Swiss-Prot record:
Catalyzes the interconversion of mannose-6-phosphate to mannose-1-phosphate, the precursor for the synthesis of GDP-mannose. GDP-mannose is an essential sugar nucleotide for the synthesis of D-mannose-containing cell wall polysaccharides (galactomannans and glucomannans), glycolipids, glycoproteins and the antioxidant L-ascorbate. Alpha-D-mannose 1-phosphate binds at residues 27, 129, 140, 147, 185, 187. Pathway: Nucleotide-sugar biosynthesis; GDP-alpha-D-mannose biosynthesis; alpha-D-mannose 1-phosphate from D-fructose 6-phosphate: step 2/2. It is found in: Cytoplasm. It comes from Galdieria sulphuraria. This is Phosphomannomutase.
Amino acid sequence: MSHIRRMPKRTDTLALFDVDGTLTPSRCKASHETLEFLRRLRDEVFTGIVGGSDLVKQEEQLGPTILEDFDYVFSENGLVAYEKGKLIHVQSLAKHLGEEKLKNVINCCLRYIADLDIPLKRGTFVEFRKGMLNVSPIGRNCSQQEREEFEKYDRVHSIRSRFVDYLKERFEGYDLQFSIGGQISFDVFPRGWDKTYCLSFVKHIPVIHFFGDKTFLGGNDYEIFQDARTIGHSVTSPEDTVKQCQQLFNL
């Protein structure tokens, strides 16, 4: 999708996208049709992505040239931020929280998961990222089929939301925020380090349209969807995202 960059026709507008469930099926690759549409959209407005995953996972889903293909790439909610292909900001969870508190949170999560009775458990239950922890009751290295089965199980048994409620009470004094996203996990980060964090890097753009699928209370798109600095659009799939953009931007 990479091409020589020209300024878009509308330099006052940014189309900012969540990744999982918005531009791609959860943890899967974007379709050629979606990527081609994003290329055309970038001729009209500035484009950007914001997600909880690190850059490596974003590249797996959207291609190895995403730093060239989008004007803004915000990994880990913008705690690792790129503008025009250049790294402009890195924030550290370990430095902010401190090793002792971080260790307490990780140990608590692992104990909770050890006692959790669910049909399947695999591996990588807590993933440490630069700006957050990603916690998965089933484990991140489950297969795609196991991922989908857990999502269905979680809808019925509220495994993640109950886990989050427990952690909120347990670490009330740590000023942490918990955000459920994707199919199998939730993120843990200091309050204010949700997706609205990335908006500080685009203050010069007056109109920001945000597109996301987890826009409900407790979802990881909720805060930025509700933020006064954005015009929020709730989507149900990559196809719905493209359709809404076509209507909005007359493409």
